[in-house]
Amino acid sequence: MKVSAALLCLLLIAATFIPQGLAQPDAINAPVTCCYNFTNRKISVQRLASYRRITSSKCPKEAVIFKTIVAKEICADPKQKWVQDSMDHLDKQTQTPKT
């Protein structure tokens, strides 16, 4: 009985401090997507819809994640020429014409 009362008291004290630990900006707790392996094959630009760069210090490698037109995400090495060319192509597609 004494153990149960002590445990209950400890849980109540801990519960008092938990909300303070959870009150953090969402960006701190946001999941980080990392690439651990890169594709060995060149992807046709006709299959690509978009890309994003991964430069987080929490990831072991800098990477580019291409999203295909069928919503598949593929990790690629940003140092490879075909990756840079594909990013340039996608950038040109998304630019709005100047009037």
Swiss-Prot record:
> This protein is called what?
C-C motif chemokine 2
- Which residues carry the post-translational modification Pyrrolidone carboxylic acid, per the record? Q24
Variant or mutagenesis effect after changing D91L? 90% reduction in activity
Q: Which gene encodes it?
A: CCL2
Give me the disulphide-bonded residues. Answer: C34-C59, C35-C75
Impact of changing H89A on the protein?
Answer: Strongly reduces heparin binding
One of its Pfam families is IL8
Q: How is it modified after translation?
A: Processing at the N-terminus can regulate receptor and target cell selectivity. Deletion of the N-terminal residue converts it from an activator of basophil to an eosinophil chemoattractant. N-Glycosylated.
The entry assigns this protein to a family as follows:
Belongs to the intercrine beta (chemokine CC) family.
Q: List the molecular function annotations (GO) for this entry.
A: CCR chemokine receptor binding; CCR2 chemokine receptor binding; chemoattractant activity; chemokine activity; protein kinase activity; signaling receptor binding
Keywords recorded for this protein, A-Z: Chemotaxis, Cytokine, Disulfide bond, Glycoprotein, Inflammatory response, Pyrrolidone carboxylic acid, Secreted, Signal
Tell me the Gene Ontology biological-process terms attached to this UniProt entry: angiogenesis; animal organ morphogenesis; antimicrobial humoral immune response mediated by antimicrobial peptide; astrocyte cell migration; cell adhesion; cell surface receptor signaling pathway; cell surface receptor signaling pathway via JAK-STAT; cellular homeostasis
